[in-house]
């Protein structure tokens, strides 16, 4: 069997198209065949993880068994008791494989952990989400078949969007109304076409054609203050465009495929560069990641701090929440100085944005606010976001230290 | 306890806006009236004043988006 990486070449799409036809016919006739859906998923999981990726495939199997056993155990326990230390332990165990995978290349540069596999970062969110919902009493039973379907849902396995168990289960168990499914098919078609333009035309143009030239130019123009040059500025914008079109393109494919399969996976991008400030930006960029951190980290931490009256200052609580959220997000990307700097950058930026928003609210009557100030805000936000992406790209590491 | 009045009072307090009762179908999140911090405060107030326990994972923004929806949810969970 050949190895095909998700959405990477025409063969993947051809096989996908052929495999999905019976599903589409079924749905249009009001029928849902879970067995067939599962066979298609298995086919694609094999295609993604065979050949030279077989070790990853084995790691994936081991990981799913481990997380399944953990979640099952915790779910059973939680129906009788609710000890906090045990909940904390369950979460720590759930993230252990990912932590190991992130630490190995940090301790041993150049080496990758044998337990790693494509998508482990994203599957871990799904697993931890399930544990937290079980803790909260929202999930009361472990359902192995649904768990496997949720975790191994192949359209989103490599890089999300990150779905949530109960939302997925609801979609999975129902047969969409014919009219609704036709609507979903329409959206899927639109997603595939837009995804194609984003990933294979724009993302390709920016990432494969322009970016290396900018990199070359920036590296050759070192010597100024902080090695800044027009080449570096060019790199910043080109990289930002590449990042958006490549990732948004992938997300469109993932969501489109999900829709054809009757699962309304949440979207990841919603005109992010039209955001007037960084708070709005995180409602529009990599949305499923942002909302996961918001709901499972930020809100829980704030709830804890406020309930236990750790401090009276709401501002301090919010700021601690932001720092925790964005630093964790930085670490999640990897144990490099630039990922952590990226997290810190966004933490500080959002804290300062809150300062500004509070000031604006207080002096509402003395601050100009019109169409032009809004454009200015969008422009400023866009540029600052691009600067944060330059940090995120790791290029500064190349520029300054190599 | 009058759920409707309590919720309106809590919201007015949180947002610093007494006119909240004039538009009970306003989307509080889209308009930026409520953010995550205010949401947590809302849940804590509901717990304290109406004895309603809402775990954070139960909170779905779609179901709690407007004052009317919040009142409906509060009544349901009482």
Curated annotation (Swiss-Prot), chain B:
Residues 1-78 form the Carrier domain. It comes from the Bacteria. GO terms for molecular function: D-alanyl carrier activity. The modification O-(pantetheine 4'-phosphoryl)serine is found at residue 36. NCBIfam families: dltC, PRK05087.1. Carrier protein involved in the D-alanylation of lipoteichoic acid (LTA). The loading of thioester-linked D-alanine onto DltC is catalyzed by D-alanine--D-alanyl carrier protein ligase DltA. The DltC-carried D-alanyl group is further transferred to cell membrane phosphatidylglycerol (PG) by forming an ester bond, probably catalyzed by DltD. D-alanylation of LTA plays an important role in modulating the properties of the cell wall in Gram-positive bacteria, influencing the net charge of the cell wall. This is D-alanyl carrier protein.
